[in-house]
Amino acid sequence: MNRLAVEIPGLSLKNPIMPASGCFGFGQEYSKYYDLNELGAIMAKAVTPEPRLGNPTPRVAETASGMLNAIGLQNPGLEHVLAHELPFLEQFETPIIANVAGATEDDYVQVCARIGESKAVKAIELNISCPNVKHGGIAFGTDPEVAHRLTKAVKNVATVPVYVKLSPNVADIVSIAQAIEAAGADGLTMINTLLGMRIDLKTRKPIIANGTGGLSGPAIKPVAIRMIHQVRAVSNIPIIGMGGVQTVDDVLEFLIAGADAVAVGTMNFTDPFICPKLISELPKRMDELGISSLQELKKERANQ
């Protein structure tokens, strides 16, 4: 028996470790460093119906224990991804989770209806932190009713399981999670980045051209752990946890808090080998802590 194996809707993971969307592209660059078959899954870069150039530069800034980014969902568009990016990933056994973004509900529906055409795509990750241009630019994921409606619309057309990525920039993440689960989501991924800003002391202006950016990295891990713990208390659907993962102990902390699998984001930029390192270190650390399997952690959680 594979003690690291995880079974969640659409995904048979050989281990619980995967790179997070936006930190791994479509895998081609990282495939030069190691065999992508080592990974539990791959969360691919966000896809929108049409190509997007993204935000003006500068759009990345370092912070203490993290980084800010405002890339603006730069991507080559659905047709290009289906024709050129996903075929490369089809050579690997590793399941692909396609991240889908949009400016309108129709954008999401359009991409989700077709992204499953690739045999590599086993699940969708719905990025609901995008601004809804038809409703004043408020992010889809900040209103329970809007999040419920979008999830339901996507579930009606998707051919693979749908995981919804939760934004931490809300007053009550539990109510958002409950609305999404009620709409039929197969799982949740959490958390997305926290909204932040840095100021250039010489120009007296924000360093990032867009003004604000998403804060990621070790600084946000305690927030992610807290939110996963809160959501797990009211939700039974799978959670893929993320937010500041650096070490194998971080991985186990996320799993104990309530996650079923863990995604690694910002650390891929610091160490491109981080995912395979964590995968290789996990069994030894489990032995040291007396954990026989990941299923054991799940049972412990249920009894808390």
UniProtKB/Swiss-Prot annotation:
Give the gene name.
Answer: pyrD
Q: Which GO terms describe its biological process?
A: 'de novo' pyrimidine nucleobase biosynthetic process; 'de novo' UMP biosynthetic process
Lineage at the top is:
Bacteria, Bacillati, Bacillota, Bacilli, Bacillales
| CDD domains reported for this sequence | DHOD_1B_like
The enzyme's main class, written as a single word, is oxidoreductase
Similarity section? Belongs to the dihydroorotate dehydrogenase family. Type 1 subfamily.
Question: InterPro entries attached here?
Answer: Aldolase_TIM, DHO_dehydrogenase, DHOD_1B, Dihydroorotate_DH_1, Dihydroorotate_DH_1_2, Dihydroorotate_DH_cat, Dihydroorotate_DH_CS, Dihydroorotate_DH_I
Swiss-Prot/TrEMBL keywords: Cytoplasm, Flavoprotein, FMN, NAD, Oxidoreductase, Pyrimidine biosynthesis
Q: What is this protein called?
A: Dihydroorotate dehydrogenase B (NAD(+)), catalytic subunit
Q: Where does FMN bind?
A: 21, 45-46, 99, 127, 165, 191, 217, 243-244, 265-266
Q: Which organism is it from?
A: Listeria monocytogenes serotype 4a (strain HCC23)
- Cofactors that this protein relies on: FMN
Question: Where is it predominantly found?
Answer: cytoplasm
